[in-house]
Amino acid sequence: MVMEVGILDAGGLRALLREGAAQCLLLDCRSFFAFNAGHIAGSVNVRFSTIVRRRAKGAMGLEHIVPNAELRGRLLAGAYHAVVLLDERSASLDGAKRDGTLALAAGALCREARSTQVFFLQGGYEAFSASCPELCSKQSTPTGLSLPLSTSVPDSAESGCSSCSTPLYDQGGPVEILSFLYLGSAYHASRKDMLDALGITALINVSANCPNHFEGHYQYKSIPVEDNHKADISSWFNEAIDFIDSIKDAGGRVFVHCQAGISRSATICLAYLMRTNRVKLDEAFEFVKQRRSIISPNFSFMGQLLQFESQVLAPHCSAEAGSPAMAVLDRGTSTTTVFNFPVSIPVHPTNSALNYLKSPITTSPSC
């Protein structure tokens, strides 16, 4: 398999991209975190769950390497002259783990995309970004939008949303989760200057009582759930994810908010990352928390997210994996998997310090 893969250095890839970037498919085999911190412009992140990796037994199907059906179809049709694999800094494929993402991707491409030349990028992203920084996209250390907290509030916001003050969760501005996805509070949603500065075109209001202030200017989607342990937020996951994707595909940006931007809206953002990037809850949670440190979904929402994880990462695993999240929670299923996250009690608008309840969250084990 290694003999069928060519070697490119940073200069070779730069020349290849200049000749025809549209005819070169870049597959980045690094982690979700590493890819989002910085990647070659136009590259696609390759990742799959531990369960899928284990079941592959060294022979991963191309549908797991390139899950996007359109890209995979172009690849199989010979539309790409070259496919380039890369990791962080490896000098060759010789040292790649046999069950690692890089080796599994190379094997699948050599078996199923035989009409396309497969290359390995020598030195990986580290060497290429040092040599060709202008061809890379890097995300700076995430910080909220720095705008002054005006004491004036739009007339539409003065009545109906009591959280439009400046407690901790309203300070700063919305935070960027992905280039097209932002998270924040109802106060931020009442600040048209903030939304316009970020290029927001649509909002998801994850509450039953916060108003949509600017319906004539932005596209809105309402998810009327309360922040309590009886609420079934998981029934909205797929609908919210599809809405975010539709805005992204149209070139827009989505701002997701609830009352405080801590529990309900954070849960929706976590579900989006888990399904679209096929990552585990703990990885998605850490990714979002690095950007908005006060996120703290309530106990029930965390349980529903853990059940959603089993559906996302092992969709063909068993009947249990596809069962509704709330049904599993109601059954009181015995547990063997324990995760520790900061988990909130329902949030109410007050100027007092935020309360956090540290406790392990459990759910039924995935297959």
Swiss-Prot record:
Q: Which reaction does it catalyse?
A: O-phospho-L-tyrosyl-[protein] + H2O = L-tyrosyl-[protein] + phosphate; O-phospho-L-seryl-[protein] + H2O = L-seryl-[protein] + phosphate; O-phospho-L-threonyl-[protein] + H2O = L-threonyl-[protein] + phosphate
Q: Which domain of life is it from?
A: Eukaryota
EC number of the protein:
3.1.3.16, 3.1.3.48
Inducing stimuli? Up-regulated by growth factors and mitogens.
Q: Which residues form the Tyrosine-protein phosphatase domain?
A: 173-314
Q: Where is the active site?
A: 258 (phosphocysteine intermediate)
Describe the processing and modification events after translation. Answer: Phosphorylation at Ser-359 and Ser-364 by MAPK1/ERK2 and MAPK3/ERK1 reduces its rate of degradation.
Where found?
Nucleus
Q: What class of enzyme is it?
A: hydrolase
One GO MF term? protein tyrosine phosphatase activity
What Pfam families does the annotation carry? DSPc (PF00782), Rhodanese (PF00581)
State a GO cellular component annotated for this protein. nucleus
Q: Which cysteines are joined by disulfide bonds?
A: none
From the UniProt record, give one GO term of the biological process aspect: negative regulation of meiotic cell cycle
Question: Where would I find the Rhodanese domain in this sequence?
Answer: 20-137
Phosphoserine: residues bearing it: 359, 364
What keywords would UniProt list here? Cell cycle, Hydrolase, Nucleus, Phosphoprotein, Protein phosphatase, Ubl conjugation
Under PANTHER family, the record lists:
DUAL SPECIFICITY PROTEIN PHOSPHATASE (PTHR10159), DUAL SPECIFICITY PROTEIN PHOSPHATASE 1 (PTHR10159:SF309)
- What's this protein's family per the entry? Belongs to the protein-tyrosine phosphatase family. Non-receptor class dual specificity subfamily.
The free-text function statement in the UniProt record for this protein reads: Dual specificity phosphatase that dephosphorylates MAP kinase MAPK1/ERK2 on both 'Thr-183' and 'Tyr-185', regulating its activity during the meiotic cell cycle.
Q: What is this protein called?
A: Dual specificity protein phosphatase 1
Species this chain originates from: Mus musculus (Mouse)
The organism's lineage is:
Eukaryota, Metazoa, Chordata, Craniata, Vertebrata
